[in-house]
Amino acid sequence: MNYTQILSRLFSVALAFFVFGCNTDDPKKEDAPELITKVTLTFTPVNGGTPIVVSASDPDGEGVQDLAPEDEIVLADGTAYDLSLELINELAAPTEEGYDISEEVKEEGDEHMFFYGWTNDLFSSPTGNGNIDSRADQVIYTDNDSKNLPIGLLTRWTTIDTGSAHSHTTPTTGTFRIVLKHQPGLKNGTSGVNIGETDMDITFSITLP
């Protein structure tokens, strides 16, 4: 083999490694879990009134701390609320890509889904205790992805009437848990909380005074 042939083969091998490297890096970046340092929940009364805003934060990002609630959820009884979630990464500048995580989740809706769980019977709608233990259980989602599957950035909740005769034994305090799953290529009509990576898992205290 002459010198020219050797150089030609070496160039071909180097080019193959370069192309292979480019093709394998990008999907990994696309499927990386989201970095979330602050979550804001806004409960807006459907029939008008002052929104209830609570938040959770994780100032060290990928460090040892987890997202922790800063507030307790306190909702009026017998009231319908629209809940919206805002997720941000405060380790990035507001103008940088990767700051507004809720927008990324919306854009990649076919890869993400929020699951909700709560103390049984705190809400008249949805009923039950949420879909963390079973995907088939009821949550009222008001947003969908491109395949018409729920995302969960927007939901609707109606609290029980604590003064009604039929609910006098129902607890008015409990917990409200939100889990965000990252399910690229896995999300479907039955994929539950055990499928995919967990981007977020927070449990708030909740009270109906």
How would you name each of these model-derived features?
Residues 1-11:
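Bacterial N-terminal signal peptides that target proteins for export
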Residues 3, 16-41:
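Bacterial Sec-dependent N-terminal signal peptides
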Residues 14-15, 123:
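Exposed boundary/loop context
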Residues 30-209:
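First exposed extracellular module after export/assembly in secreted or surface-exposed proteins
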